[in-house]
Amino acid sequence: MKAIFIILAILMVTQAFKMTSKVNTKLQSQIQSKFQSKNKLASTFQTSSQLKYYCWEEPYTSSITGCSTSLACYEASDCSVTGNDQDKCNNVGQNMIDKFFELWGVCINDYETCLQYVDRAWIHYSDSEFCGCTNPEQESAFRDAMDCLQF
């Protein structure tokens, strides 16, 4: 009889340790999960801040036209000398569209930033101080190519 009580006592103590261990493991996992989500949030915030700066900084402005990365505006680093030449303007427009898709989901991730990008890109494309591609019929095609309505 004594042996049965001893065995039951050992089983109860073992069970209590298992329960405590399960509770501790679950608690530890919840704490770890909270820290991970906080770290993820902090990381996202930091990344967003960096991207926000990257997306609208001055060197980015020149890369909208591709002048910093391609030969489309080879006559002038500031893009001002296209002379409204159709081939050069087509190259610049293609660079802008390529840049748009390169930045998709990074800089351009909602309707508002999409419109900001398109407006800014169109100014660079059409303004005589920048690329000087002033064909007004191209504006709607240019805006249509960068379909902001999909957001």
Swiss-Prot record:
It is found in: Secreted. Residues 17-52 form a propeptide. Its main location: secreted. It holds the Pfam family Euplotes_phero. One of its GO terms (cellular component) is extracellular region. Keywords: Pheromone, Secreted, Signal. GO terms for molecular function: pheromone activity. Residues 1-16 form the signal peptide. Mating ciliate pheromones (or gamones) are diffusible extracellular communication signals that distinguish different intraspecific classes of cells commonly referred to as 'mating types'. They prepare the latter for conjugation by changing their cell surface properties. This is Mating pheromone 3.
